[in-house]
């Protein structure tokens, strides 16, 4: 689709304009559009339209024989109109900034050490570790290690996980 190609071309241009050390730009766009109809046995009907879009950009920067990368992106339960030029500029700036920081970075420390994860995207680690087993379809079919365990402790004391499908415009959000 021509509009999507133009969007990616704009994103590439914004990234290259940010810093002359940018030698490569890789941009990706993805989207889906679902129409969901739920029909209960009592005749109640509920419908939802669920768009989902995502754009990402990765840049390679080179300086003094060293090459580093940075990436950024975003999206959510929107249509492609979500990706304004201002938003695309933000993604390009963030990717270039990350690559620039990486160019100036020294070696990372190595070895065993404590790690503290804050809220937000680190939740992906949690999702990959246990999240798929918590998804409704696996539990409905009884194929999850968590099937039939509602109300029971399934993690170490002190671990609390809340899956909130009411957060607006997020990937796992529901509006019905």
Regions inferred by a protein language model and the residue ranges of each:
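Active-site bordering "gate/hinge" segments
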Residues: 1-174
């Amino acid at each position: 689709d021509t509009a999507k190609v133009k969007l990616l071309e704009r994103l590439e241009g914004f990234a290259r304009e940010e810093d002359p050390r940018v030698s490569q730009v890789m941009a990706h766009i993805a989207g889906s559009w679902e129409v969901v109809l739920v029909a209960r046995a009592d005749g109640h009907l509920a419908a939802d339209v669920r768009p989902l879009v995502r754009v990402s950009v990765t840049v390679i920067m080179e300086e003094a024989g060293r090459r580093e990368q940075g990436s950024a992106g975003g999206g959510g339960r929107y249509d492609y109109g979500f990706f304004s030029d201002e938003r695309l500029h933000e993604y390009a700036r963030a990717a270039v900034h990350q690559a620039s920081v990486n160019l100036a970075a020294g070696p990372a420390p190595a070895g065993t050490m404590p790690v503290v994860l804050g809220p937000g995207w680190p939740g992906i680690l949690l999702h990959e570790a246990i999240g798929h087993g918590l998804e409704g379809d696996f539990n409905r079919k009884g194929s999850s290690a968590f099937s039939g365990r509602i109300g029971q402790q399934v993690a170490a004391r002190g671990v609390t996980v809340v899956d909130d499908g009411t957060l607006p415009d997020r990937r796992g959000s529901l509006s019905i």
